[in-house]
Amino acid sequence: MNEAIVVGVNDSPSSEAAMGWAMHRAATLKLPVQLVHAVDDRWAYDSVGYNEWIRESGINFLAAAKDRAAKMEPTVNVTTDLVSGGAGYALGKRSKKAAMVVIGSGHGWAGGSLTDRALQVAAVARCPVAVIGEHDMTHRKGIVVGVDGSEEATQAVAFAAAEADRQGQELTVLHAFLTPEPWVTRGVPHTNYFEVITEEERVVLAETVAGLADKYPDLVVHQVLDTHTRPAEALLAAGATAQLLVVGSRGRGSFKRLLLGSTAHAVLTKLPCPTIIARISPVKHSD
């Protein structure tokens, strides 16, 4: 049996949008879907029947969600899973055997910030994580992927290229960074210091996309090098008109202890469009 797309569902509008996005993807890729709903048992007291009540409420919620999902894509096999406690922990655990985890942005407005639980899922999942908001997708086109020379970014490009080729979309590979302030470079012997840095990063960008033309001969790839904008800001701007944004779980500047890098975190908290954290396989770091 194919690995399922696991969807965290609750009663928020963004969760409904996430379920719709996941169902469409599942139908296209011929994958099953598992709807996971977590009930809050922090105030559970058997003496007042709370446990039974929240469980029954959760069962009813999942049954209704399954019915709505079936109407969205009748050909997709949908199962449900009711869990107690934190949604972040439950989805993270199920990500080990999932094709993808899909969650809503956590709030009822487009571009709204993520809840702590949603960020937790994005940080600990062992598979790609799609975060979906209530964005108007009219007139949006193209897939954008952020790169920085890290192994995570290379995996993100591989994922984004496959998505763009499958969907018939153009791919924009964006490498953004800020060159050092003038006061930082005082005393540096190279008079063309900024040019040297820029050229080195241009090579990083070129190496990141190397091989895509051979693997996807019909894929249109745009390489963008931005030396005047912080990575997160550049990705947010590019994602504002994109159909999909793909980022790595963390970049080359992240500490080993961080499960979610600062750029990915910043992008998710201001979600510009459907965004995927492309965690494909574990990457070992020496730092």
Task: Tell where the protein language model's regions lie, with residue ranges.
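Small/aliphatic-rich secondary-structure junction motif
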Residues: M1-E52, G142-E195, A213-Y216, V220-H222, ...
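Short glycine/serine/threonine/alanine-rich loop segments
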Residues: L29-P32, V76, C127, Q169-E170, ...
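General small-molecule cofactor/ligand-binding pocket signal
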Residues: Q34-V36, T79-V83, A130, T172-L174, ...
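A short acidic, glycine-rich active-site loop
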Residues: N51-N60, T191-V203
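Glycine-rich, Arg-bearing micro-motifs that act as flexible, cationic patches
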Residues: V102-A122, R140, L244-A266, K270
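Short beta-strand elements of ligand-binding domains
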Residues: V102-S105, P128-E134, T275-R279
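Extended, non-globular alpha-helical segments
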Residues: S113-H135, V188-P189, V196-I197
